[in-house]
Design a protein with these regions (language model features):
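Repetitive helical segments and hydrophobic/amphipathic motifs
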Residues: 11-12
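Short linear motifs in intrinsically disordered
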Residues: 80-85, 99-101, 140-149
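Lipid interaction determinants
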Residues: 21-79, 87-136
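Sec-dependent N-terminal signal peptides
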Residues: 6-8
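Extracellular/cell-surface secretome signature
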Residues: 134-185
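C-terminal motif of bacterial Sec signal peptides marking the signal peptidase cleavage site
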Residues: 15-16
């Protein structure tokens, strides 16, 4: 009789835990997000955070950190597609296993690095605002930053709002459309 009672108590526990925590493929987190602010124990002297973008491609479980390689703030390798997983409110980057809590508020994403207790002052929070670029502006499958392009300066304004030195460079960064000339600030 005791075994039957224990079995009746254990079975609901087993079934209540199964299948409730699914991998999040949040469709609302899609496309261009522009960095607005960073909160950390670090110093940014009049830094323009909006030069940095994060692009989400949930159908492919990919994201791309875009910005100036020499002066950018990135959560992944700059301008290269990276696999990710969102599970139970945590964004995990496959390439380096860094984890961030992710909070989605209407047109805003807040990423907070999950602190490593063995490292002092590694707390950092990124606040991104939804951008206006078309979802098909960047194709992560077309990114090939190892493409050899000429150094000719023939600037183009990419659909992502960045000025690229020439059309070849824009295409190698996965930009699907651009206009001749520099982007206006």
């Amino acid at each position: 009789m005791k075994k039957l009672i224990i079995l009746l108590l254990v079975i609901p526990l087993v079934f209540s835990c199964s299948g409730t925590d699914e991998v999040s493929k949040t469709a609302e987190i899609k496309g261009q997000y522009i960095l607005q602010n960073v909160s950390c124990l670090c110093y940014f002297d009049n830094y323009d955070f909006t030069k940095n973008q994060l692009w989400f491609f949930p159908e492919q479980d990919m994201l791309v950190s875009k910005g100036d390689i020499s002066d950018g703030i990135f959560i992944t390798k700059p301008n290269e597609p990276s696999k990710f997983l969102i599970y139970d409110g945590v964004l995990t980057l496959n390439e380096n296993e860094k984890e961030y809590t992710i909070e989605v508020k209407q047109n805003e994403i807040i990423l907070t690095y999950i602190d490593n207790p063995e490292i002092a002052d590694d707390e950092i929070t990124y606040i991104f605002k939804k951008g206006n670029a078309s979802l098909d502006c960047i194709n992560p499958k077309d990114i090939s930053i190892d493409t050899v392009c000429t150094k000719e300066y023939d600037p183009v304004c990419g659909c992502d709002g960045y000025t690229y030195s020439n059309p070849c460079v824009a295409k190698s960064y996965g930009v699907s459309s651009y206009k001749m000339g520099e982007c206006s600030s």
